[in-house]
Amino acid sequence: MLKIHNSLAREKQEFIPLTPGKVKVYVCGMTVYDYCHLGHARVMVVFDMVQRWFRANRFDVTYVRNITDIDDKIIRRAQENKESIEALTARFIQAMEEDAAALGVEPPSWEPRATRHVEDMIAMIQVLVDKKLAYPASNGDVYYAVHRFPGYGKLSGKSLDELRAGERVIVDPHKNDPLDFVLWKAAKPGEPQWDSPWGPGRPGWHIECSAMGEHYLGEHFDIHGGGQDLQFPHHENEIAQSEGAHGHPFVNYWMHNGFVRVNDEKMSKSLGNFFTVREILAHFQPEVVRFFILRAHYRSPLNYADMQLEDAGRALDRLYTALKGIEVHDEVEIDWDDPYASRFREAMNDDFNTPEALAVLFDLATEVNKTRLPRDIALMKALGGVLGLLQQDPWKYFQQADSEDPAFAPEKVEQLIQQRLVARANKDYREADRIRKELMEANIILEDGPHGTTWRRATGLSTL
């Protein structure tokens, strides 16, 4: 029985799908005006893990992760770069897809772009206006009337009085209430615009997800996810829009992953501790980064530090070391009655407890090192695959470069190993030791065995 921590109920609840055997999931994706940072990576990896677990349990999964390709930040960045919004967003969408693929994130069922669903957004805004839950302002904007939706604040646990007391921003004179939020923004010179019943303009951010979620998943679906920073106001506003428009529940389970911190400080550009996925992948293998993300429970804070990635690399090394030496070519059906598989399932069914699931893999690796049975290795790979891990050939994993230094490309390493073998055959041990030391200084570890010398690159030894 799967239990999910529902942010709306503030407790773990048994997952009961709206339709038996099917699950519909919507996750807020990127606003594409820059490269993915570690926070984006965490959202992508966490909910990739979630959908993989549902599929492993034979659910028919419809997974939607949107792309926000029209937004104030996008417009501002395009103006700064003196490029079109279309060129800017296309560039960063491609970069996002490359980063996601590197991290082993499977493509969602649907990845809608906001600009392709403006008609859906206009239609929903019209419903809200007709129901007196929204009002056109004199400047051409349309606002949601928060006080007219009785359930506002139920996701965040905030009352309207508390929210008003904490309001510090300059109040827009066109709003009836400081808490009202924009659904439609009147056109400004040089900005993209669409025709609407309220004049030309563009949609607000919050209405985008309500409209796209409904388009692909219906008015009522199972799970909505995203980062903890979106719980308020974005997700709170989505509930107000969708439930206000349709008069019934919008989503049954709300999931929020925790914040990312860097060296125990909030990640931010102003603190100079802001890293893109590409910057991190220049120093650490993609699978190490994925392992690092899943090593923490998705609701816990994720603290990034070089030493944490280095430790994750060493831990992943131990798992791959157990897989070395015995080839398993066929995928196996997981026997959930197996003691290790049963423990793994119990961990994952407890609100996707990946740290406990990984602990099972380490126990299984210990067993594999003792037995060397293909059956155990196949099970280890299959369980790892549920998390998107351990699918590489172990030898290739260990030989992946952690830098682009051509002096130690695989061909060069093999050449040096042959030179070392010749030196040893000639009893020139000084030269053999010199070559080993040279390779060690390049983070390349040699392993001499009965079948010859193999090598691997030490993971996680570079720093940002």
From Swiss-Prot:
| Sequence motif: 'KMSKS' region, positions | 266-270
Please share the entry's free-text remark on the cofactor.
Binds 1 zinc ion per subunit.
Reported cofactor(s): Zn(2+)
The UniProt entry annotates the motif 'HIGH' region at 30-40
Q: Where in the cell is it found?
A: Cytoplasm
Question: Which NCBIfam families does the protein's record reference?
Answer: cysS (TIGR00435)
Q: What is this protein called?
A: Cysteine--tRNA ligase
Q: What is the lineage of its organism?
A: Bacteria, Pseudomonadati, Pseudomonadota, Betaproteobacteria, Nitrosomonadales
